[in-house]
């Protein structure tokens, strides 16, 4: 499919883990320039959050990512407040994550919905997304990917196997 893209477009192969990303790279051997292979987190950081976060939200201080327990929260607005006031991009607490919520995906979706330049950028840059291990996606990830398809017209190719789900608790 990478040969069918316009010269400005890319195809993204997205997976859950760095190991799976490396496996895909090894299998492809000769990766075309218009193919991006990354984890879901890395894709969201590089393509949506870092380039467009400050267009959507006013940040009082430079952004830093944190997975420390002391910064975890259970509410989207609390997470946004932490980003805007302290520059700390943290994650939901375990109880909230178990409900199928993923703060990074929710922020990325919010940016795409409310920041036209972000949605236009993604729509024109990526023709297709190949999502591996889709069975491990939580509800927030699913919502984000379905938005990319329905609202931005990005084609999705989803690969998953319920029997291999390692994150069934995610919802």
Annotate each PLM feature.
Residues 35, 128-131, 156-157:
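Hydrophobic "anchor" residues on beta-strands that sit immediately upstream
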Residues 14-16, 133, 159-160:
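Short His-Asn-centered micro-motif
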Residues 7-8, 123-125, 150-153:
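Short loop/turn elements that form and flank the Walker-type P-loop nucleotide-binding site
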């Amino acid at each position: 499919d990478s040969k069918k893209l316009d010269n400005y477009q890319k195809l993204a192969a997205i997976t859950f883990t760095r190991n799976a990303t490396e496996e895909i790279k090894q299998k492809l051997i000769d990766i075309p320039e218009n193919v991006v292979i990354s984890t879901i987190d890395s894709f969201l950081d590089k393509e949506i959050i870092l380039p467009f976060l400050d267009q959507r939200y006013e940040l009082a201080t430079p952004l830093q990512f944190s997975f420390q327990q002391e910064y975890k929260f259970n509410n989207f607005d609390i997470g946004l407040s932490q980003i805007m006031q302290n520059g700390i991009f943290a994650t939901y607490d375990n109880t909230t994550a178990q409900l199928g919520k993923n703060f990074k995906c929710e922020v990325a979706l919010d940016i795409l919905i409310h920041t036209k330049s972000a949605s236009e950028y993604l729509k024109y840059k990526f023709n297709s997304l190949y999502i591996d291990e889709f069975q491990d996606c939580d509800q927030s990830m699913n919502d984000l990917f379905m938005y990319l398809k329905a609202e931005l017209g990005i084609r999705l190719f989803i690969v998953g196997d319920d029997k291999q789900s390692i994150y069934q608790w995610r919802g």
